[in-house]
Amino acid sequence: MAVASSTVPSKEQIFAPESLLKKKKTQEQSREQRVAAAAEKKAAQQKKRELIAKRAESYDAEYRKAEREQIELGRKARAEGNYYVPDETKLVFVIRIRGINNIPPKARKIMQLLRLIQINNGVFVKFNKATKEMLQVVEPYVTYGIPNLKTVRELLYKRGFGKVNKQRIALSDNAIIEAALGKYSILSIEDLIHEIYTVGPNFKQAANFIWPFQLSSPLGGWRDRKFKHFIEGGDAGKRDEHINSLVRKML
């Protein structure tokens, strides 16, 4: 007589369905969390894009207002028979025009401090008493002047690189700028342009983040007497607003 097989379910058979249900529930919860996180991230990104766009509009209005004020001050001065002299600039753009030969140690040290390591390197510098004295020492080896908004913007858009973990990274995405400067409320390239151009409270951090610009030799070449001072027909030293036309030739 054959022994009837047991109909009592084993321990594995009893708990297998429950474990499968738990696994399925966990997977479902995980999927829901991922969907919710993705939706939250998308909403945050949209909000950030709107903030960046709003800031850009605000900056544009600010730049236009400042330009109108300068024009009006000039007109008023002329109407009164005077000559309008703008406030001394807070920002200069400095370009190294000479190589490493025959540069005295003090001037060489200042060039290193300014991060002008190679010929045709360019940097934004806050113009104050200390940097003014430094630039006077290195005048024979650099040229510098007052960059306008167009120059600042074109430099950053066309030749802008950031320093990320000591690496030279192209500023191709606002996320790169935000990761480095977000704690200073600099989230986009337009924020960066504004901070540099207006010499804002976080100028030092912004300028140090920007890798020294590597420019090309100017279209048409340097002047024949390149190392003479600009006012003597050369290229060295202070050139005020004429730095803008030079930068255009070097982009």
UniProtKB/Swiss-Prot annotation:
- Compositionally biased intervals (Basic and acidic residues): 26-40
A single BP term in Gene Ontology:
endonucleolytic cleavage in ITS1 to separate SSU-rRNA from 5.8S rRNA and LSU-rRNA from tricistronic rRNA transcript (SSU-rRNA, 5.8S rRNA, LSU-rRNA)
**Keywords in alphabetical order:** Cytoplasm, Nucleus, Phosphoprotein, Ribonucleoprotein, Ribosomal protein
Q: Which Gene3D superfamilies match?
A: Ribosomal protein L30, ferredoxin-like fold domain
Keyword Isomerase carried by entry = no
| Residues bearing PTM Phosphoserine | 58, 245
Gene Ontology CC annotations of this record: cytosolic large ribosomal subunit; nucleolus; nucleus; preribosome; ribonuclease MRP complex
Main subcellular location of this protein, as a coarse class: cytoplasm
Q: Where in the cell is it found?
A: Cytoplasm; Nucleus; Nucleus, Nucleolus
Name one molecular function that GO assigns to this entry.
structural constituent of ribosome
Its function, per the record, reads:
Component of the ribosome, a large ribonucleoprotein complex responsible for the synthesis of proteins in the cell. The small ribosomal subunit (SSU) binds messenger RNAs (mRNAs) and translates the encoded message by selecting cognate aminoacyl-transfer RNA (tRNA) molecules. The large subunit (LSU) contains the ribosomal catalytic site termed the peptidyl transferase center (PTC), which catalyzes the formation of peptide bonds, thereby polymerizing the amino acids delivered by tRNAs into a polypeptide chain.
The record ties this protein, via NCBIfam families, to: uL30_euk
> Extra info from the record?
There are 3 genes for uL30 in S.pombe.
Q: What is this protein called?
A: Large ribosomal subunit protein uL30C
Q: Which organism is it from?
A: Schizosaccharomyces pombe (strain 972 / ATCC 24843)
**Taxon lineage:** Eukaryota, Fungi, Dikarya, Ascomycota, Taphrinomycotina
